[in-house]
Amino acid sequence: LITSSAASDVYKRQVLALFAFPALFVSAVMMLFDKLLMTSFFMPALVEFGENLSYGGGSPILFQHLFWFFGHPEVYIVALPAFGIVSDLISIHARKNIFGFRMMVWAIVGIGALSFIVWAHHMYVSGMNPYFGFFFATTTLIIAVPTALKVYNWILTLWKGNIHLTIPMLFCLGFIVTFLNGGLTGLFLGNVIVDVPLSDTYFVVAHFHMVMGIAPVL
């Protein structure tokens, strides 16, 4: 029986890494073959000295699919240990058991499973089949549910707790606020219609840094 959120989340992180990193490795090998062996996995055409070579059939979008199939679970590979540490620190410094511990554990299981079917929300403007966008928008909104559950449970753990505002606790509170802001911006970017005009803007940069950059570092 795992009674530590940190231990539970680190374990699930290893499972995610086990399934996510092979996609990155395969895409790197295929790209190496394109460069050295003149295969055509990702490159649709090749021009040398102004002449089109007999070279075709590759798809740059295939590389994006492989990269983001790794890339989105990798966000949680980075964030899950932070989730577990924050849960344990909040419980300790609020002098309360973590609210809904079993739900927190199952929320991480749900996040881990869903993280493998949301990758193409990074690719709404890449040229992929637009009908796929609506499927991935739906799964992206669904993954927000267990993520929000963790935030609610952190807040409910603090509710009426004997809170000690030590330095670790202040960092945890900063994590919650930062991650909450990052998650709310993600709701906009997960929607196909809203994401298209926001692509390549600082809105995306802010979302990335609040979720992936600042929050886990805190």
PLM features: what roles do these ranges have?
Residues A6, F69-G71, T147-K150, A206, ...:
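Hydrophobic transmembrane-helix microenvironments that flank and shape a buried ionizable site
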Residues L1-A7, Y11:
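Single conserved hydrophobic/aromatic residue that forms the stacking wall/gate
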